[in-house]
Amino acid sequence: MKYSVFSGVLPELDAEQAAEAVRRNGYDGIEWRVNGEYHFREAEIDRAAPRLKAISEAAGLEVCGLTTYVRLDQEDSIKRLADAANIIGCPRFRLFSALYDPAKGYRAIYDDTVEKLKRVEALLKGRGVKALLEIHFGTIVCSPSLAYDVVGHCDPAVIGVIHDPANTIIEGGMNARMGLDIIKDYVDLVHVKNIRWERTAEGTWRWRFDELADGALDWRETVSALKDAGYDGYFSFENLYRVPVQHRGYVAEDISDTSLPPRDIDPRLSGDLAYMRALVEDV
């Protein structure tokens, strides 16, 4: 296994500082957030690619992914991302999946998504880079089985999945081993974080980020299932627990939580890595 940090958990730092923090705490790679606020802008990613590559290489980090919010129908942006990824030597980038909208209905959204994804597949064929959809609540790929229904039409050498098991605690949860049995051929990156549910003052329930070891997701069972499924790629840490987030989430959800003070950067990066490494070695 290899270990990386999603730069979205380092909103306090610029790109150079983020790469140095990741290096300093012993990681193998970095997954760069490519969006408006930080760390690189999608519209400029082809021009920024040499700088992104230089920053990463100076820190001794492999760029394991570019995490974008580009839609499946934005073909010019996808071409730009593919060109940038080739310059950087990055094998994958994330595209934004389709949100579920009951007014449109699942079947219509599904058919449209599969059609667009097939066009993306044709666009990337032979380019040496893979487009990923993230298993994420609020989307039509909120579980491994639903994700397979979409990506299963495509070549796993070109189209893949970011498996985010903590997201399925919020929506889409299923047995860890069964989920990986379904989607394992397409899993190309794994996001690491944890989630808890808490009752609000109004008596309703909402989710919050939590410590890796304390949340509702059983990471020991998840790592065991990943190993048994043959996964040996990157664990990329997207642990936003007590991080001073400066943006809304993937589906525009409020991911801020000021109930506890932010954790210092080095202790959280080193602590998360130590926890996961020990777990991987022990399972």
Where are these regions (language model features)?
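Structural motif corresponding to the early beta-alpha repeats
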Residues: 28, 32-121, 125-130, 167, ...
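A generic secondary-structure micro-motif detector
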Residues: 8, 41-42, 71, 110, ...
